[in-house]
Amino acid sequence: MERMTAWVHGFVQGVGFRWWTRARALELGLVGYAANQKDGRVLVIAEGPRDKLETLLTLLRSGDTPGAVDLVVEQWDSARGDLTGFVER
């Protein structure tokens, strides 16, 4: 199990982006959250198997999201195991 932190840049607030991300993450069996940041980005924290996390990352970059994603910067770590479900914050 791994943990992915993704900073999503672009027009991603107020357009259903967090809801969409939550739906995709739940379909993949991931846990974590998507949270709006004051600077306009969305922070996505997700834990699960590496292949499922990479699928979510591909979806975030796909161009088929609500709004418009300009850039996704990700960081990988070991899972902490402190998350349950996948929520919007």
UniProtKB/Swiss-Prot annotation:
EC numbers, comma separated: 3.6.1.7
Family the UniProt entry places it in: Belongs to the acylphosphatase family.
Gene Ontology terms for molecular function: acylphosphatase activity
Highest rank taxon of the organism: Bacteria
Pfam families listed in its UniProt record: Acylphosphatase
PROSITE patterns referenced in this protein's UniProt entry, alphabetically: ACYLPHOSPHATASE_1 (PS00150), ACYLPHOSPHATASE_2 (PS00151), ACYLPHOSPHATASE_3 (PS51160)
Domain Acylphosphatase-like: 3-89
Protein name listed in UniProt: Acylphosphatase
Catalytically driven reaction(s): an acyl phosphate + H2O = a carboxylate + phosphate + H(+)
Class in the EC hierarchy, top level: hydrolase
Catalytic residue list: R18, N36
Keywords, alphabetical: Hydrolase
Organism: Rhodococcus jostii (strain RHA1)
Alphabetical list of InterPro entries matching this protein: Acylphosphatase, Acylphosphatase-like_dom, Acylphosphatase-like_dom_sf, Acylphosphatase_CS
